[in-house]
Every structure is written in C-alpha cells, then in structure tokens.
Amino acid sequence: MNNRRVLVLGSGVTGKSAAEFLRNRGDYVIGVDGSAEALHSCHFFCERYLDSAEEFPEDIDLCVRSPGIKTSHPFVVEAKHRGIPIVTDIQLAFQDPEFHRYPSLGVTGSAGKTTTVLFLVHLLRSVGMSACAMGNIGFPILQAMYQKGIRVVEISSFQLAEQEIEIPVLSAAAILNISENHLDYHYTLQAYTEAKSHIAKCLQSPESLWVGDGVSFGKSYLEATREINLVLDKGSALKPLYLHDRNNYCAGYALANEVTKIPLESFLQAVLTFDKPPHRIEYLGEKDGVRYINDSKATTMSSVEKALIAVKENIIVILGGRNKGSNFASLIPVLTQTVKHVVAMGECRTEIAQALSSSNLPLTQAQDLQEAVHVAQSIAQPGDVILLSPGCASFDQFRSFEERGDCFKQLVGEMEALKI
C-alpha cells in the first residue's frame, strides 16, 4: 500500500489532509492545483504541478480527487484514460484500518446533512456513547478518524461522484432527501442523484440504508418514525420545531438505533437540549414589528421552499448570489403564496428577475447584500419578516455561506433596539 506515486488534485483543506495521510504511509505525493501559492503552502507534496500544465506526471499509481475538483477536470480525464484508480478522501479513509476501529454512520442528502450529523453525535453522547463528527462537516475524515468513538460522517455528492469500488464499512447510512442541487458540478439531476446513491456501496448491509424525500430505494425513515415525528409536532410547545428539523432529528434517531437502542425519552430529551447550527432559519430578533431570519445556508431551491413554508407569510425574501444551475422559476408557486416582495441580489440578480417575471411579484434588484438589506428594510412594515434565504452559493461576494450569514447578522445587529 505504500511507496506509491500518488497524484492529489487540489491543495485545500481536504487535499492537504490527504497529502499528509499518504506521506505518513510512505507514499510519494504529487500535488496539483490552480494556485502556485496554495501548492507551496502544503509541505507534504514531493512535487507540484499547476493544473494548467499540459504535462501529466508519469508512473502514477493512484489519483486522489479533492471534492472541489470536477470529474471533468483534465487531470481526472487523463487519469481515467490511463486506467489510474481515482478516489476521494472518503474512500481513502474507508479503506484504512484506523477507520474500522469503531462503528460508523454516513449521512448525505441535498439538505439537512450538518444538522443531522451534529444531532446524531449529540444523541449518541447523551446516552453515554462516544461519537465524533467528521467529513464534509469541516473536520477532514483523514485527520478526524483518529478520534475515539462512533464515526458520524457527512458525505457530499462531490465525494461520492463516480465511485466505482464497493467498500462495505458503514453500519448504516441515510440519504436524507434529493432535490435539484449542484447542477453546475454534476450538470444533470440524474448524475447528481447517482452520486448520492453511491453511499450504498459503502454499507455493510443494503438493509441499513435509510432514505427520505426524492429517493426511490431504501427504507423510508419518514415512514418508520411517523409516530415519533407526530410526538415532536405535538410537543412543539416545549421547543418550536419546523417540519424539516423534525425530519432531520428522526433520521438521526433511525441511524442511532442501528448501533444502539435509544429510548424514546432519551431521544426527546436530546431534541430539547440540541442547539441547531447557525444560518439555518435562524431567528435574529425584531425591530419596529419586523422580524429578521438568517437562512444563509439555503443554497438550493428546495431549501428556500422549506424556509418559505416554515415562515408562512408576509415575507420579504432576499434571493441571490452565484447560481449553482438552479431554475428560480420553480419557486413561483410557493413565492406567490408566502412572499410580498422579492429582493434579488448579487451576481445572478438579473437572472432571478427574468425567471420570476411571469409571477407579477414585486421585485427589486440589489447589487450586494448590504444594499439588499437596505431595500428590504425600506419596504418592510410591522408584521413583516425579512428573510435571507438566497438559494445560491455565496462566492460572488463571500468566501462561504457562514460569512454571508454573519454579514447579514452584522447588518441587522447594527439596528438599535433589536428584540431577541
């Protein structure tokens, strides 16, 4: 397994973790990236190539593709042409004995992955079990797998795309839902769905795959936890819960029960004590009768729709950013039922305006988030809700959806007398 010549595509957080992992196992690691600065910031590379180079390194035994590197990348295409095995950090970890020391659970889907993973870790710990989150959640799996406890792995479609090998390591997994997403990467919904389905290749048993909306195979966690979901709904006085939150918690409950028996009372207590991560329909407060909600994590049409349904009415919604290949016209039915004004911001503001032109909804374009908030505030009246739910990536103005959400909070927080 060692002394191989391994090509690592991408020198971001994941690429660096892969390079470190491989070097520690005696491999000769060659890095490829579009940035010379990024390449030289990783001292685990033995050689470095800019991805604009026409020359493909010789005698490569393995290619490791970082999630941000498309499967259409010239180096990926050339590796396929030469018959070189291509894996991601997920497959590297799943094949390593270190990962196998504890049971593992996998979570993928179009929306709700991070919330489900964090809740699952919280739930397992609440009943006295060791558990740790890793993967696409921000803790690279090749570094985090050295922790003790049940591995709860968030897995993106980028990490599963074109997986060919079967690695039966996961005790159970969930595809929470599938809706139109990342079409700028996968190009078609079929390819995106196929990528998500590859998580089944990582299961010890096909009977341990739980699925939600938009998935036609596997066991429905929504059906299996229907009565528990109703309990959560009726118990909302104890803690207000949106439907998608209840679904995420029920998915976590189904997965947790694959590795240990969770009493219903323990599950309900875990729901009560769980702090949902920020930027997900996050209530910020009220000023002059206008409520403010930060849903910066919403980068898909499905997520925006869920937010609009949750908030219900009198909404001034801020949409926009960098489109990921979505069709905003698909939002017209729910927008017309819930929204009084649309503020379209950022790189794709004109595209949004054109897509929604047949709806006759009032719409104002804004160059950036700061202007969008100003426009929304100038329109809002007591009883209205200003909802940031962009339906787009943030990269036209920000480095991440977190930075975008924090900027929104700062803009809102600059108002005096905001009531939380």
Curated annotation (Swiss-Prot):
It comes from the Bacteria. It catalyses: UDP-N-acetyl-alpha-D-muramoyl-L-alanine + D-glutamate + ATP = UDP-N-acetyl-alpha-D-muramoyl-L-alanyl-D-glutamate + ADP + phosphate + H(+). GO terms for cellular component: cytoplasm. It is found in: Cytoplasm. Coiled coil: none annotated. It is an enzyme of class 6 (ligase). One of its GO terms (molecular function) is UDP-N-acetylmuramoylalanine-D-glutamate ligase activity. Keywords: ATP-binding, Cell cycle, Cell division, Cell shape, Cell wall biogenesis/degradation, Cytoplasm, Ligase, Nucleotide-binding, Peptidoglycan synthesis. Its EC number is 6.3.2.9. ATP binds at residues 109-115. Gene3D superfamilies: Mur ligase, C-terminal domain (3.90.190.20), Mur-like, catalytic domain (3.40.1190.10), NAD(P)-binding Rossmann-like Domain (3.40.50.720). One of its GO terms (biological process) is cell division. Pathway: Cell wall biogenesis; peptidoglycan biosynthesis. Belongs to the MurCDEF family. Cell wall formation. Catalyzes the addition of glutamate to the nucleotide precursor UDP-N-acetylmuramoyl-L-alanine (UMA). NCBIfam families: murD (TIGR01087). This is UDP-N-acetylmuramoylalanine--D-glutamate ligase. It comes from Chlamydia abortus (strain DSM 27085 / S26/3) (Chlamydophila abortus).
